[in-house]
């Protein structure tokens, strides 16, 4: 992959992850999304943020408590969501949001996409953990 993003769905998912991660450190919704979308653009002007990116970020933000509750229910005994790394927590929220609430994307596609992003931003162990947890929500009928 080159240093610049295209505008593929995977790239926009990755930017959504970056925006959500930034927001965990105090960034607000629009500025975090704009930064994630513009940070590697050649020109200095801001670009319109694609609706798909905004939908993912806004969806995770609006469903964060519900997503966290679902994730907590599926962690091993003795584990808490706070024990997870911020990277893994953010990816679980993003992947789970797309699987549970974003019907435009088939579950398996959402799962595979978040696994590929996890491999880039985390390690193989985390990618397997995310796969194991999120695969419980993937419908076999797809």
From Swiss-Prot:
Keyword Metal-binding attached? no
Q: Does the keyword Signal apply?
A: no
A GO cellular component entry from the record: cytosol
Annotated signal sequence range: none
* Lineage top rank: taxon: Bacteria
Q: Name one GO molecular function term.
A: RNA binding
- Functional summary from the UniProt entry: Involved in transcription antitermination. Required for transcription of ribosomal RNA (rRNA) genes. Binds specifically to the boxA antiterminator sequence of the ribosomal RNA (rrn) operons.
Designated name of the protein = Transcription antitermination protein NusB
Protein's gene: nusB
């Amino acid at each position: 992959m080159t240093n610049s993003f295209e505008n593929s769905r995977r790239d926009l998912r990755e930017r959504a992850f970056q925006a959500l991660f930034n927001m965990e450190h105090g960034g607000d919704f629009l500025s975090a999304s704009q930064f994630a979308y513009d940070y590697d653009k050649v020109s200095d002007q801001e670009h319109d943020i694609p609706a798909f990116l905004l939908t993912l970020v806004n969806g995770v933000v609006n469903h964060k408590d519900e997503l966290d509750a679902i994730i907590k229910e599926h962690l091993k005994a003795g584990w808490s969501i706070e024990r997870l790394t911020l990277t893994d927590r953010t990816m679980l929220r993003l992947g789970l949001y797309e699987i549970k609430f974003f019907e435009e994307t088939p579950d398996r596609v959402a799962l595979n996409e978040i696994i590929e992003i996890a491999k880039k931003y985390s390690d193989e162990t985390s990618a397997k953990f995310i796969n194991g947890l999120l695969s419980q929500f993937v419908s076999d009928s797809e």
